[in-house]
A protein has these predicted regions:
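Periplasmic peptidoglycan-binding/anchoring modules of Gram-negative envelope and division proteins
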Residues: 1-13, 247-280, 305-309, 347-352
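C-terminal/domain-edge helix-coil "capping" segments
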Residues: 1-15, 101-190
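A short, hydrophobic beta-strand-centered structural micro-motif
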Residues: 19-25, 50, 55-99, 104
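Alpha-solenoid helical repeat scaffolds
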Residues: 123, 169, 200-205, 237
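Short, surface-exposed beta-strand segments enriched in small/polar/acidic residues
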Residues: 15-31, 236-246, 263-300, 318-331
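Periplasmic OmpA-like peptidoglycan-binding domain that tethers envelope proteins to the cell wall
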Residues: 31-44, 217, 250-254, 282-352
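A structural "domain/chain start" motif
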Residues: 1-42, 150-165, 170-171, 224-227, ...
Length: 352
């Protein structure tokens, strides 16, 4: 990819060295950063330093982004034997793209495949701890810029319009992963105040930093915004963790301690909006599928029940469904923190 980069970009003068920033690589389905995506970023930086001196790697910061450098992005996407994202991941498709902010176009692309044994999908702390997932235009734009494109194509506007906020988010994630929760909160709050800062991952970050700092009331307030965001985008996946093979939540208070707050907030935000919801349980692809379907339905009903208890008006506006492992997002079948999203409970807005 580096060797084939079309430099200088059309309409720009040649340079002895080209500034490059790396917007951290992510999982192509969930948008999460993992042990492997982080390691790949380090490896690419080392490669440019040692083999491609024409590239001058800079920190991914708002100040450096303002100078319109090249931006390196990439995705790791689990695929099955048919190279599709459904079902169990039997390989990983690695997509890399080098984008020029000055011209607004891609200058190079790279594609490779890796076996699962060489990939550690364990999410970094922020993504492991994030309470919920929803479709986020910022992440969607990143993925669409990398996947299904070729050199010379324009950078997806969903990504380009949010890259300043993305640089602040990257710094905030690093601060959270390092346990610097006040710094993380300040950075997430700063990202939120930018023109394109109202992003799902930003709200997740403000919630998590407040919770870690012991500010439960502030965390509850932000979780309400998380719920509203998900419902506004028609889909909210919440990481309720259950005991293996059971409909009961895990007993570890570090994991399930916030669940009463989540349930109360979901009930409050849903009951006031007049929306109808399908509550859908999911499982990872381990065990017989008929049992997975039954278990996922029971878990959906287990979550639905306290919502109706907190707000009786929801009884006529919610249905429960279970889809087993038909809609995995990770697909590793590891049944640990790396594939928690495969065991999510999802709230989808449906017609009343």
């Amino acid at each position: 990819m580096f060797k084939n980069a079309k430099l200088p970009p059309e309409g720009t003068p040649a340079q002895a060295r080209y500034a490059v920033v790396i917007d951290p690589l992510i999982d192509g389905m969930t948008g999460a950063q993992s042990v492997t995506t982080q390691a790949m970023g380090v490896r690419l930086t080392k490669m440019m330093h040692e083999q491609y001196p024409q590239f001058d790697v800079k920190a991914f910061s708002a100040a450096n982004v303002a100078k319109s450098p090249l931006v390196l992005i990439g995705t790791f996407t689990g695929v099955n034997a048919e190279r599709k994202t459904a079902g169990t991941s039997e390989a990983y498709r690695i997509c890399l793209a080098l984008a020029d902010l000055r011209s607004g176009k891609l200058v190079s692309k790279g594609l490779a495949f890796a076996l699962p044994d060489s990939v550690d999908p364990t999410p970094l702390a922020f993504f492991r701890d994030a309470p919920a997932w929803s479709e986020d235009p910022a992440t969607e734009g990143y993925i669409k810029t990398c996947q299904g494109t070729k050199a010379g194509d324009p950078i997806n506007p969903l990504y380009l319009d949010r890259i300043v906020a993305a640089s602040l988010v990257a710094e905030a994630i690093d601060a959270y992963d390092a346990g610097r929760y006040q710094d993380a909160l300040d950075l997430y709050t700063g990202a939120l105040s930018t023109p394109a800062g109202n992003q799902f991952r930003v709200l997740n970050g403000i919630y998590l930093a407040n919770w870690k700092l012991g500010r439960q009331q502030q965390a509850e307030t932000v979780f309400a915004r998380i719920v509203d965001y998900g419902l506004d985008h028609q889909r909210l996946a919440v990481k309720f963790l259950f005991r293996p093979g059971s409909t009961a939540f895990v007993q570890d208070p570090k994991l399930s301690g916030p669940y009463p707050v989540w349930l109360k907030t979901i009930a409050t935000q849903t009951s006031g909006g007049g929306k109808c919801l399908e509550v859908t349980g999911h499982t990872s692809p381990t065990g017989p599928e008929p049992l997975n379907e039954r278990l996922s339905l029971l878990r959906a009903e287990y979550v639905k029940s306290p919502l109706e208890g907190a707000s009786p008006v929801l009884a006529k506006r919610m249905i429960a469904n279970g889809v087993g492992s038909k809609q995995t997002m990770v697909g590793t079948g590891r049944d640990d923190a790396s594939d928690a999203l495969d065991r999510r409970v999802e709230f989808k807005v449906i017609g009343c």
